């Protein structure tokens, strides 16, 4: 056996254990040099001490610490360096042993392959001899029997070659028994019967071809199992590897501990004993503990060196003392010492670089070895593939023999041709298993054999072939000659279409050697270890690595490139040496100057020493980095060696399985030789035997196939099995069952092989099964443990749809139908109809009541969809007279973040009741979100109330109705159009009554929508016949519809904002020391806010008119007085949308007829701090305010008897953009003042009495529509409620802001009776600090004012005054319709096409009690949320009074004071 792929085999394995010891000797020399270096440094320390002594400036104590520190670091560095070198040397030694073992295994496998190929060639020649035509009279009888016996012997020989050595004894016994059976079966009569039954020679050919293929190029990928392949002629002498220089006794111990294969070998000169790895089987006894035992003496040696260094340090101290005492130091002597030290340092550096070059050479050699092994593996894989193809072809040929043909053609010439074809397939198999350099000879042999086959095609020649006697000796000689003519290396063709890789064996392809060497040294390395060339011969195999990371294009970096990379490092080391030499000369100069001029100072020397230490540290760091690179390369080679070892194990398993298949085929051939009955030796028996041969051939093909091709092989096997079953008739199957032969082993083989993908004899594991064997496990010390990333499962808790079925106290019944509907809803509804919502009225709070969060629901950091739906209450108002607010239905959904195309098509008829907080006690702690606290959420709330019929009759004696609340959290999307028209919107005030002194500030009494995108739409619709009942009842309940719209880019903003009214916000009776608050109605700080209030056409309702006609004024007044005592202010309808933030192209073309009232501050007491923006505080904002009043017909008649009228106000915060047109037409806009009355003492500031929309993009649209005949009631009520349209326009820079601002009036903002020490507050109506705010109030076209005018004419001025005074005492300000839109953060081109006829009423604050803590978001606290709120108020008209005494009278029991 000749190993041609490794550097340690044959002539290329000169480097034995002695050479390894020679390599380790420089390390010993290095250690000695280190000792000398330390000794010389000690003398240098003595020199420094003597110089300091001469100049009388040396302080030994200071230098002592520095010297000790330097010595300690040097010692630690040396110890670490030696330990690292020991580890690297140990790893290199282990890998050497491993490479030797793998190379030995490869050699053995090559030898097995060669022997199997020779056996298959012999069998092929024997079959050809059977085809040779001989004399006809000798074609039968004993000769055929002997030839068959010879074929069996050749098959046995093939099995023997594929068997391990430890099984030879058993095989010999089996062979003796089989030979005896063959000889007993040699009777002429039985041989003649066998000839008459047409013994299938194709089956013999199948046996030969299959067996010759079964031992092909390392057959299996299965792991090696209990098979140890060793040959007597391959036994190798073992020597030892000694890693460190030690005494003779230590070397002897190492020889006893760790035997290593030597370089010499008999017969084939192979140097590998280990079959499955150096750390496996009985030869892997040296584990980690033994390695530690070997390293312990080295540790002891290092400790001894440390003790010696410590002693030398003390000697240095003694020398310094002596030099100080005796003054015997001479500089000339020191000069020689320094030169000697430099010379030794240079020598040390050179030796160190040489050692590094040697290590790099070793790494290069290992790289070459890995390349060679990888090439060998590639060739074996190619052989395996070719053998598999040849066996598959033979299988198909045998199946063709089984195909039923015409009976007259199944004999004679056809059989002869089929046998010839089988011989050709067998020759092809032998050719595939032969090396390339023998292909020419094989081709000549094939040509001759083909000619012989063609010549032997006649029946006469066939008879002659049967009569011929082929000499067995010549066959044996041929087999021996062929076995010797072929080398172990088969082919240098790359692997074709089959890439066997494992994920755990993937290796990084960038293996770079970082050591440096000169060109000459690298050339010497090339001469020492030549790389195998590209040509293949009997002993030299070309290596083209095609299946590994270092093969083909990835292996371009050869030795010259490595040398080029190492040269810069060599130059760098030389430069470092020069720098050290220069520093040493600097030290000499400093010493000379100190001696001659008496100017030596320790401080200067101290800096020099520190600099030297710093450079030394840098050098150590660079050296450690270089060692880390070497360790990384070793790790990569570890992985590569392991992968190759695994593949070798799998190839061994394939070899074992092929041997088993060949043994089965041998048994089948013996069964053919068994004498049977003469009548059963033909026909069905031959057919069954051929089928059995086909199955064995299929099994052999399966064994030679890789695991990843099992699926294809299964399909082929199923088809073959079907053909075989179809080719046998039932009669033949019955005969097969009656036959006594084949033997049990053959039956077992047939059953096993008939399974398409089952394991054979439990030796082939399942295709998807991970198989490990203890014999093949590799030592874990050579494998770097891989870190596995642990992935934790993210648990997403999604709240389910919940429905609150509990009814609170003092709440009325709920419709069961609507409750069922709200519970069953899973998606956002397009229309939320008939929604009722009741207010949250907290009872009296005790003192020091702690704060709570989210009384009803606290949905923090959630995307919540809340839908509260109360169904159509048509006749339930009659029953509401003596009961509190009804309990709403609550349906809560957490909707997914999606992009719906349509959000809410229609939010109609939505009612909402106010949130009233009564009689809160002192020191009440703040709480947040009395109804809902939805912090950091995107929340959509829609409150929809619809079709309350006959509502006006029972509104006198009942509490505020419970509106339906439908709330949705809408997905973030980009709708194209937002709201084309927001019509008929009313808004009512939020009244805060009798809050005690010291009330802490709170935020967002109704809504605190901080840092949110808010859209509030208050829509009041279809107010029919409400003018007559407004005298006798409190403010009606508006409809509430609220939507959270997408963050989108609507194209339309507001084409026309028409007819908008706005009323003031009044704060009454605030006591002294009232702290400042912000945004009494809306606090929209740092937000983009859009508010639009639109009041529109109020149509006539005949039924309501008739009812008013039926009732007299006296009855209405009496009903109003009775109703005001028993009810709370009703909830208006509110429709609110959040609009997107966009850049509108057209904003407002013309701002016409703009009226604005002044802001008046009345009666502010002393020490009252300033406040900002009583009506609007728009600090640091670009604000456009348009107040438009138009077509006030006969308005002067009623101005005498009423409070100052509320003009129409249109206000806009223009976006930061350059729009082409701002507002097309803002017509007839009124605005009323904001009054603050009698705030109690020490009232703490609060923020956003109605809405606190801080840091939000807000759009509020209040739309009041179709108010007809409202002029008649203006005489008996307070200042009328103007129409208010407010928008927050985009952050844009308009080119044209206001084309025409005509007829603009401004009314005052009245702050009444503010007590002393009242702290400043901000934005009584709106506090829009640091925001871009657009507010537009548009009042338009009040139709049919003539009838109202006539009614005023019928009443005298005195009656109107008396009615107004009585009305002011008996009623609360009514709730107008409010339609509010929260605009999205986007760039809309046009926002609202038409906002018509919008009214808004003020927000009143009454009698806050003492020590009242601030709270946030009385009704809703939606912090950091995208919220849309829509309130729609229906059937109401609002009148404002600023009288707190009447409110105390009206709330009787609740406000006793």
From Swiss-Prot:
Gene Ontology cellular component annotations, sorted alphabetically: cytoplasm
Localization in the cell: Cytoplasm
Compositionally skewed regions (Acidic residues) per UniProt: 165-181, 436-452, 801-810, 821-833
Biased composition (Basic residues): 1102-1120, 1346-1364
Basic and acidic residues bias spans: 190-200, 461-472
Keywords: Coiled coil, Cytoplasm, Repeat
Region (Disordered), start-end ranges: 162-200, 432-472, 721-746, 791-838, 1100-1139, 1344-1378
Tissue/organ expression: Widely expressed with highest levels in brain, ovary, mammary gland, skin and adipose tissue. Also expressed in testis. Detected in a number of tumors including osteosarcoma, mammary carcinoma and hepatocellular carcinoma.
Disulphides: none
Location of the Olduvai domain: 165-259, 436-530, 707-799, 800-871, 872-963, 966-1021, 1022-1114, 1115-1207, 1210-1265, 1266-1358, 1359-1457
Coiled coil: 75-119, 339-390, 610-661
Taxonomic superkingdom: Eukaryota
Cytoplasm as UniProt keyword: yes
UniProt KW Coiled coil keyword: yes
Principal subcellular localisation of the protein: cytoplasm
A Pfam family the protein falls into: Olduvai
Family statement drawn from the similarity comment of this UniProt entry: Belongs to the NBPF family.
Note: Encoded by one of the numerous copies of NBPF genes clustered in the p36, p12 and q21 region of the chromosome 1.
Protein name as it appears in the record: NBPF family member NBPF12
Name of the encoding gene: NBPF12
């Amino acid at each position: 056996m000749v190993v041609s792929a490794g550097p340690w085999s044959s002539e290329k394995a000169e480097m034995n254990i002695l050479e390894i010891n020679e390599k380790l000797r420089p390390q010993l020399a290095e250690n000695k040099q280190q000792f000398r270096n330390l000794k010389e440094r000690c003398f240098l320390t003595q020199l420094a001490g003597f110089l300091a002594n001469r100049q009388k400036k040396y302080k030994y104590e200071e230098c002592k610490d520095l010297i000790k520190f330097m010595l300690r670091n040097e010692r630690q560095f040396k110890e670490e360096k030696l330990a690292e070198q020991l580890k690297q040397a140990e790893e290199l030694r282990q890998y050497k042993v491993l490479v030797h073992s793998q190379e030995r295994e490869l050699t053995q496998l090559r030898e097995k392959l060669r022997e199997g190929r020779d056996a298959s060639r012999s069998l092929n020649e024997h079959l050809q001899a059977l085809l040779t035509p001989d004399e006809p009279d000798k074609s039968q009888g004993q000769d055929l029997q002997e030839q068959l016996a010879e074929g069996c012997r050749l098959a046995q020989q093939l099995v023997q070659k594929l068997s391990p050595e430890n099984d030879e004894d058993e095989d010999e016994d089996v062979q003796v028994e089989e030979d005896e059976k063959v000889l007993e079966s040699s009777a002429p009569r039985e041989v003649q019967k066998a000839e008459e039954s047409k013994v299938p020679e194709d089956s013999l050919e199948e046996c030969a071809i299959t067996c010759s293929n079964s031992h092909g190029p390392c057959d299996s990928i299965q792991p090696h199992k209990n098979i140890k392949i060793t040959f007597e002629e391959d036994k190798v002498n073992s020597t030892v590897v000694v890693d460190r220089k030690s005494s003779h006794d230590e070397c002897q111990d190492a020889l006893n501990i760790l035997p290593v294969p030597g370089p010499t070998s008999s017969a084939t000169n192979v140097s590998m004993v280990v079959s499955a790895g150096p750390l496996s089987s009985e030869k892997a006894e040296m584990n980690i503990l033994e390695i530690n035992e070997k390293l312990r003496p080295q540790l002891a040696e290092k400790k001894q060196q440390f003790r010696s260094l410590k002693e030398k340090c003390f000697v240095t101290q003694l020398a310094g003392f002596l030099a100080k005492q005796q003054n015997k130091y001479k500089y000339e002597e020191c000069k020689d010492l320094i030169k000697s030290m430099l010379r030794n340092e240079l020598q040390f550096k050179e030796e160190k670089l040489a050692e590094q070059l040697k290590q790099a050479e070793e790494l290069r050699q290992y790289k070459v070895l890995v390349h060679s092994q990888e090439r060998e593996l590639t060739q074996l894989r190619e052989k395996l593939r070719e053998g598999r193809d040849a066996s598959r072809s033979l299988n198909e040929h045998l199946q063709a023999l089984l195909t039923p043909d015409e009976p007259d053609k199944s004999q004679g010439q056809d059989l002869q041709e089929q046998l010839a074809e089988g011989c050709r397939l067998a020759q092809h198999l032998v050719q595939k298993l032969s090396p390339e350099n023998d292909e020419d000879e094989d081709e000549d042999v094939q040509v001759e054999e083909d000619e012989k086959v063609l010549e032997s095609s006649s029946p006469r020649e066939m008879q002659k072939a049967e009569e011929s006697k082929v000499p067995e000796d010549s066959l044996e000689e041929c087999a021996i000659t062929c076995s010797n003519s072929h080398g172990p290396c088969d082919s240098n063709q790359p692997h074709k279409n089959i890439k066997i890789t494992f994920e755990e064996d993937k290796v990084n392809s960038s293996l770079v050697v970082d050591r440096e060497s000169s060109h000459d040294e690298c050339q010497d390395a090339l001469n020492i270890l030549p790389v195998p060339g590209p040509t293949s011969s009997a002993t030299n195999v070309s290596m083209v690595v095609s299946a590994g990371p270092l093969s083909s294009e990835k292996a371009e970096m050869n030795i010259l490139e490595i040398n080029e990379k190492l040269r810069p490092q060599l130059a760098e080391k030389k430069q470092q040496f020069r720098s050290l030499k220069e520093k040493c000369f600097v030290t000499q100069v400093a010493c000379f100057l100190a001696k001659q001029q008496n100017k030596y100072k320790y401080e200067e020397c101290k800096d020099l020493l520190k600099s030297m230490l710093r450079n030394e540290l840098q050098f150590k760091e660079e050296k450690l980095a270089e060692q880390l690179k070497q360790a990384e390369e070793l790790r990569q080679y570890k992985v590569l060696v392991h992968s190759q070892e695994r593949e070798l194990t799998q190839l061994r398993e394939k070899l074992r399985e092929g041997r088993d298949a060949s043994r089965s085929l041998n048994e089948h051939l013996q069964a053919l030789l068994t004498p049977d009955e003469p009548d059963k030796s033909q026909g069905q028996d031959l057919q069954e035997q051929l089928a059995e041969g086909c199955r064995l051939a299929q099994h052999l093909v399966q064994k030679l196939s890789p695991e990843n091709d099992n699926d294809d092989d299964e399909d082929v096997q199923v088809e073959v099995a079907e053909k075989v079953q179809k080719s046998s008739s039932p009669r033949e199957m019955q005969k097969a069952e009656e036959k006594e032969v084949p033997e049990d082993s053959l039956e077992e083989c047939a059953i096993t092989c008939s399974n398409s993908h089952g394991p054979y004899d439990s030796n082939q594991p399942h295709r998807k099964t991970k198989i490990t064997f203890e014999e093949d496990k590799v030592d874990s010390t050579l494998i770097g443990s891989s870190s596995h990333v642990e992935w934790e499962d993210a648990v997403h808790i999604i709240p389910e749809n919940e429905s609150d079925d509990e009814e609170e106290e003092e709440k009325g019944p709920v419709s069961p139908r609507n409750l069922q509907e709200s519970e069953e809803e899973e998606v956002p509804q397009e229309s939320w109809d008939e929604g009722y919502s009741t207010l949250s009225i907290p009872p009296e709070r005790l003192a020091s009541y702690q704060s709570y969060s989210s009384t009803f629901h606290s949905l923090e950091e959630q995307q919540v969809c809340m839908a509260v739906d109360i169904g159509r209450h048509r006749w339930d108002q009659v029953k509401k007279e003596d009961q509190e607010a009804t309990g709403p239905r609550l349906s809560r959904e957490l909707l997914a973040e999606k992009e719906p195309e349509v959000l809410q098509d229609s939010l109609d008829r939505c009612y909402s009741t106010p949130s009233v907080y009564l009689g809160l006690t002192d020191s009440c702690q703040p709480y947040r979100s009395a109804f809902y606290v939805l912090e950091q959420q995107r929340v959509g709330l829609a409150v929809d109330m619809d079709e309350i019929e006959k509502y006006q009759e029972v509104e006198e004696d009942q509490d505020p109705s419970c509106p339906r609340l439908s709330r949705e959290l809408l997905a973030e999307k980009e709708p194209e159009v937002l709201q084309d028209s927001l019509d008929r919107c009313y808004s009512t005030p939020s009244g805060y009554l009798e809050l005690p002194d010291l009330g802490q500030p709170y935020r967002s009494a109704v809504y605190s929508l901080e840092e949110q995108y808010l859209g509030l739409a208050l829509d009041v619709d279809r107010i029919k016949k409400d003018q007559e009942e407004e005298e006798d009842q409190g403010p009606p309940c508006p409809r509430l519809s609220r939507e959270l719209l997408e963050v989108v880019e609507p194209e339309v903003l507001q084409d026309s904002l028409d007819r908008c009214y706005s009323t003031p916000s009044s704060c009454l009776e605030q006591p002294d020391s009232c702290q400042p608050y912000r945004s009494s109605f809306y606090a929209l700080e740092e937000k983009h806010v859009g508010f639009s209030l639109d009041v529109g056409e109020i149509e006539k309702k005949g039924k309501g008119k008739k009812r008013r006609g039926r009732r007299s004024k006296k009855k209405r007044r009496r009903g109003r007085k009775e109703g005001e005592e028993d009810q709370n202010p009703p909830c208006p309808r509110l429709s609110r949308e959040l609009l997107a933030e966009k850049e509108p192209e057209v904003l407002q073309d013309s701002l016409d007829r703009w009226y604005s009232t002044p802001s008046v501050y009345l009666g502010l007491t002393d020490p009252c701090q300033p406040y900002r923006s009583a009506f609007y505080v728009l600090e640091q904002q670009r604000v456009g305010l348009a107040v438009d009043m138009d077509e006030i017909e006969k308005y002067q008649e009623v101005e005498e008897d009423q409070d100052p009228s509320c003009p129409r106000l249109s206000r806009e915060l223009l976006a930061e953009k350059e729009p082409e047109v701002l507002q097309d037409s803002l017509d007839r806009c009124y605005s009323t003042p904001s009054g603050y009355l009698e705030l109690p003492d020490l009232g703490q500031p609060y923020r956003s009495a109605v809405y606190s929309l801080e840091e939000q993009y807000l759009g509020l649209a209040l739309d009041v529509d179709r108010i007809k005949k409202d002029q008649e009631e203006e005489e008996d009520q307070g200042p009328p409620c103007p129409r208010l349209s407010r928008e927050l326009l985009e952050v844009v820079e308009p080119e044209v802001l206001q084309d025409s601002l005509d007829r603009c009036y401004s009314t005052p903002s009245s702050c009444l009776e503010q007590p002393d020490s009242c702290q400043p507050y901000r934005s009584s109506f709106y506090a829009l600090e640091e925001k871009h705010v657009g507010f537009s109030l548009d009042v338009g076209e009040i139709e049919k004012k003539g009838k109202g005018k006539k009614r005023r004419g019928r009443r005298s001025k005195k009656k109107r005054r008396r009615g107004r005074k009585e009305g002011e005492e008996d009623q609360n300000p009514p709730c107008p319709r409010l339609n509010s839109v929260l605009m999205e953060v986007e760039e809309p081109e046009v926002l609202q096409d038409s906002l018509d006829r919008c009214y808004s009423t003020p927000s009143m604050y009454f009698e806050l009690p003492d020590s009242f803590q601030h709270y946030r978001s009385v009704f809703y606290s939606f912090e950091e949320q995208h919220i849309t709120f829509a309130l729609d108020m229906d059937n109401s008209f609002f009148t404002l009074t600023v009288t707190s005494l009447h409110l105390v009278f009206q709330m009787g029991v609740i406000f006793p004071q």
